[in-house]
Amino acid sequence: MSEEFQESDIIFSDQSKISTSSRYTKLYNSRNDEKKGTRRHETAEKTSPVRIPTNNFRCLEWDTTEEEDDKTPPHVIIERRMKEQIAFSACTLKGRDLSRHRNSVLRMTGFLEA
């Protein structure tokens, strides 16, 4: 009679081997740590702490002595540029006007040849 397997036994067969070996490794390492516990404690005391540099760029102060009138905020500059570029039409294009407008745009961009 042949042995019957579950799907998980076939697919995850290597996991069972790893888990038993990892248990042994953990047990082995924990026994060695008990023996070497004093050495690790001594080396931990000898090492110096890690020095983390401070970020001084967060503490910058703005120079407010200059005249504020000369400076224009960036969002105002962008708004002015957008107003210059955009042209509006009050009516919506429908039917034949829309197709003419579409064709003229396609000719200008090079997608349609005249």
Swiss-Prot record:
Pfam families from the UniProt entry: Senescence_reg
Bias type Basic and acidic residues, positions: 31-45
Broad class of the protein's primary localization: cytoplasm
Domain of life according to the entry: Eukaryota
Stretch list, region Disordered: 23-50
Keywords, ordered alphabetically: Cytoplasm
GO terms (BP aspect): cellular response to hypoxia; leaf senescence; response to abscisic acid; response to absence of light; response to bacterium; response to salicylic acid
UniProt induction comment: Slightly induced by dark, abscisic acid (ABA), salicylic acid (SA). Triggered by pathogen attack such as Pseudomonas syringae pv. Tomato DC3000.
Record InterPro entries: Senescence_reg_S40 (IPR007608)
Keyword NADP: no
Keyword Cytoplasm found: yes
Any one Gene Ontology cellular component term annotated for this protein: cytoplasm
Annotated localization: Cytoplasm
Family statement drawn from the similarity comment of this UniProt entry: Belongs to the senescence regulator S40 family.
PANTHER family named among the record's database cross-references: EXPRESSED PROTEIN, PROTEIN S40-2
Protein's recorded name: Protein S40-2
